Swiss-Prot record:
Subcellular location: Cytoplasm
Taxonomic lineage: Bacteria, Bacillati, Bacillota, Bacilli, Bacillales
Catalytic activity as recorded in UniProt: cytidine(34) in tRNA(Ile2) + L-lysine + ATP = lysidine(34) in tRNA(Ile2) + AMP + diphosphate + H(+)
Annotated binding of ATP, by residue: S25, G26, G27, P28, D29, S30
InterPro entries: Lysidine-tRNA-synth_C (IPR012796), Rossmann-like_a/b/a_fold (IPR014729), TilS/TtcA_N (IPR011063), tRNA_Ile_lys_synt (IPR012094), tRNA_Ile_lys_synt_N (IPR012795), tRNA_Ile_lys_synt_subst-bd (IPR015262)
Cited PANTHER family: TRNA(ILE)-LYSIDINE SYNTHASE-RELATED (PTHR43033:SF1)
Molecular functions per Gene Ontology: ATP binding; tRNA(Ile)-lysidine synthase activity
Protein name: tRNA(Ile)-lysidine synthase
Keyword Lipid metabolism: no
Enzyme Commission number: 6.3.4.19
Alphabetical list of Pfam families matching this protein: ATP_bind_3, TilS, TilS_C
HAMAP family: tRNA_Ile_lys_synt
Main subcellular localisation: cytoplasm
Length: 472
């Protein structure tokens, strides 16, 4: 009880007149928290229990719910419950069961907070949980706020989440239950080695407690220091990213990569994390600091243009000083690129739209190639060739036609989607003459009667594993 009072005083929290939702599983931690808050507040606050049956353990799960309901009835407490098919939710969302259970719980808690216009959601995470969480994050390579573990107080729903037990241990909670004659339910799955947290709890935590009995307090101090440092760095990062971000929508963010890479590394990492937090509804559990560093290395050293795949369908499209983070299917807004075909050897240019252009010397031309193949020679056009995006005023001298035609009009005639036009490849020779619009139109500079010994065959085709970088 003293620990709860100390927690409330430290964080300047007043429970008098408040509505407090308590997440109650029926286990010793949540039963102790419900009892402590009810005893502390009496009738000066409205304490409400909220229980979720995840339906993982059949009849046992339902018995947990009945146990919580019976306790609340005896204590004259309101009890809100929900039975959720978490397994089905996990399959639908592509999540593991633990992540799915957490999603379902917090969605339910938010609904109950809204229903009662609650001020607080009290959760029974304790000091041992905090140590486990921070170690698991560290082992995964998490940086920034995530490494600080669970926050003692944070905004949520109509109010705030509070975790009054973060400075006490599981052993102290069990002692409180025994001292106050509290019954509780036991979840046998907490003893299984199937879950990462359980393995940390059974192997790592006992060693740390043996070395330092107050390890939970030390970790909590580290957590608070990391949080304070992170808040300062986040503030700096937001100021700098306002200069780095050039445009954004609900599904995409475009940045100037040169300006990002000019920032100190701690701000670079946090800048990318801010973008991810903005774009992802929930950052995938598979995401780690490795992905952020991978992006930064690629942005600096990966060539002028390309595409990087992130989890859950997020792509980063790079073109010179621009990087576009997007969930859109190639609806890339004005992402220019430019590659060269020297003509000296067989070459391949891989394009950001998922296609490539191959240049092959002395090759036989396909029997039916249409506009996806262009045949020429160094006698017919001047090398090097350039593959680029369109420019204002572009015109092409079409095969079988007098004069020239605007590239813009060709795109309109072909009903090319507006979002694809700025990224459609155009091939020019060394003088800047447009010789080919791959897949759409050819110029007068194609020659089908060139001998094999002189011919260069250009082919435009789809490439599934696009990474958008020219190579020879």
């Amino acid at each position: 009880m003293k620990s709860v009072k100390d927690f409330l005083n430290k964080h300047n929290l007043t429970l008098k007149g408040a509505t407090i939702i308590v997440g109650v599983s029926g286990g010793p931690d949540s039963m102790a928290l419900l009892h402590a808050l009810h005893t502390l507040c009496g009738r000066s606050a409205n304490v409400i229990a909220a229980h979720v049956d995840h339906r993982f353990r059949g009849a046992e799960s339902e018995e947990d719910m009945r146990f919580v309901q019976a306790y609340c009835k005896a204590e004259q407490l309101v009890c809100e419950t929900a039975q959720i098919n978490v397994t089905a939710y996990a399959q639908e969302k592509g999540l593991n069961k633990q992540a799915a259970a957490r999603d379902c719980r917090y969605q339910f808690f938010e609904e109950i907070m809204s229903k009662h216009q609650a001020d607080y959601l009290a959760l029974a995470h304790h000091g041992d949980d905090q140590v486990e969480t921070m170690l698991m994050k560290l082992a995964k390579g998490t940086l920034g706020t995530g490494l600080a573990g669970m926050q003692p107080v944070r905004r949520f729903g109509t109010g705030r989440i509070i975790r009054p037990f973060l400075t006490i241990t599981k052993e102290e909670i069990l002692h409180y239950c025994h001292e106050n004659g509290l019954s509780y339910r036991t979840d046998e799955s907490n003893a299984k080695d199937d879950y990462t947290r359980n393995r940390f709890r059974k192997t790592v935590l006992p060693f740390l407690k043996q070395e330092s009995p107050d390890v939970h307090k030390r970790f909590q101090k580290v957590s608070e220091a990391l949080t304070e440092d992170e808040q300062f760095l986040q503030s700096l990062t937001k100021d700098e990213m306002n200069k780095v971000i050039t445009s954004q929508s609900n599904t995409s963010v475009e940045i100037n990569s040169s300006q990002l890479l000019a920032l100190p590394m701690p701000l670079q990492r946090r800048g990318v994390q801010l973008i991810l937090n903005y774009l992802y509804e929930n950052v995938p559990s598979s995401f780690s600091a490795h992905h952020i560093q991978q992006f930064l290395d690629w942005a600096e050293n990966g060539g002028p243009s390309g595409v990087l795949d992130f989890p859950k369908g997020l792509k980063v499209v790079k073109s010179y000083q621009t990087c576009l983070f997007t969930f859109e299917q190639w609806q890339c807004k004005n992402v220019p690129f430019e590659y060269q075909i020297s003509g000296a050897a067989d070459e391949t240019a891989v394009l950001p739209n998922g296609y490539l252009i191959e240049a092959r010397h002395y090759a036989d031309s396909p029997e039916e190639h249409g506009n996806a193949v262009f045949i020429t020679s160094e006698k017919k056009v001047r090398f090097p060739l350039t593959i680029r995006t369109r420019k204002a005023g572009d015109r092409i001298k079409l095969k079988g036609m007098n004069g020239s035609k605007k590239v813009k009009d060709i795109f309109i005639d072909k009903k090319l989607p507006l979002q694809e036009r700025d990224n459609w490849p155009i091939v020019t020779d060394a003088s800047g003459e447009i010789i080919w619009i791959p897949g759409l139109k050819k110029s007068i500079f194609e020659d089908l009667v060139i001998p094999n010994s002189d011919r260069i065959v250009l082919q435009y085709r789809q490439h599934e594993k696009c990474r958008g970088q020219a190579k020879s």
